[in-house]
């Protein structure tokens, strides 16, 4: 079973998240940020990851802490569910269009968290979320999951750009964590990720 449940409580947020990497794409998402709920539901569906997120945060201030901490918790849960990486494909990429927008994502689920993000959002991005916060979410996720990600987005509509990015990341992740029976071991010459 490649599952994980993580709880994180700080003075700013309280988050409980569970996931199943080998799920069907079922999502139960409650973050208090409707647009972000939509993005996480898309992530679950297109990654075929069963994902449950219950989050409360200091949204009266702004959505920064909530979105950042969900990235931390999701990354932690992904790292736990992948475990030592035995048998995973490890590398994958995906390109997802959404009308005029296009997102390209290449991943290495190799234990080293790093993000390269190319593309722009409006200062007040999709769903009223500050545009730079979308990139920050992926940075938090990758850092805590031990995933290197290169994300490139183009387009004019912030909603389309963001949704394409979440879907492309999910599809690449699904392929990268897929078990390849031919591998059978940790996919690294070092013997560990």
UniProtKB/Swiss-Prot annotation:
Major location category of this protein: cytoplasm
The protein's annotated pathway: Amino-acid biosynthesis; L-histidine biosynthesis; L-histidine from 5-phospho-alpha-D-ribose 1-diphosphate: step 6/9
UniProt KW keywords: Amino-acid biosynthesis, Cytoplasm, Histidine biosynthesis, Lyase
Catalytic function, reaction form: D-erythro-1-(imidazol-4-yl)glycerol 3-phosphate = 3-(imidazol-4-yl)-2-oxopropyl phosphate + H2O
Gene Ontology CC terms: cytoplasm
Known EC number: 4.2.1.19
A Pfam family annotated for this UniProt entry: IGPD
InterPro entries, per database record: IGPD_sf, ImidazoleglycerolP_deHydtase, ImidazoleglycerP_deHydtase_CS, Ribosomal_Su5_D2-typ_SF
GO BP, sorted A to Z: L-histidine biosynthetic process
GO molecular function: imidazoleglycerol-phosphate dehydratase activity
Location in or out of the cell: Cytoplasm
Similarity remark: Belongs to the imidazoleglycerol-phosphate dehydratase family.
HAMAP family tied to this protein: HisB
Name under which the protein is recorded: Imidazoleglycerol-phosphate dehydratase
UniProt source species: Methanoculleus marisnigri (strain ATCC 35101 / DSM 1498 / JR1)
């Amino acid at each position: 079973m490649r599952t994980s449940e993580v709880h994180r409580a700080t003075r700013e947020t309280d988050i409980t998240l569970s996931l199943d990497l080998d799920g069907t794409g079922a999502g139960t998402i409650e973050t208090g940020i409707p647009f972000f709920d939509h993005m996480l539901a898309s992530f679950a569906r297109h990654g075929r990851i069963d994902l449950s997120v219950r989050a409360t945060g200091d949204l009266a201030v702004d959505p920064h802490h909530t979105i950042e901490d969900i990235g931390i918790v999701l990354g932690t849960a992904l790292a736990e569910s992948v475990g030592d990486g035995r048998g995973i494909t490890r590398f994958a990429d995906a390109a997802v269009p959404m009308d005029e927008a296009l997102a390209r994502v290449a991943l290495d689920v190799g234990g080293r968290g790093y993000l390269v993000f190319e593309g722009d959002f409006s200062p007040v991005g999709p769903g009223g979320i500050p545009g730079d916060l979308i990139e920050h979410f992926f940075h938090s996720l990758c850092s805590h999951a031990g995933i290197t990600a290169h994300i490139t987005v183009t387009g004019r509509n912030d909603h389309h750009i963001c949704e394409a990015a979440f879907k492309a990341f999910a599809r690449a992740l699904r392929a990268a964590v897929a078990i390849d029976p031919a591998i059978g071991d940790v996919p690294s010459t070092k013997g560990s990720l």
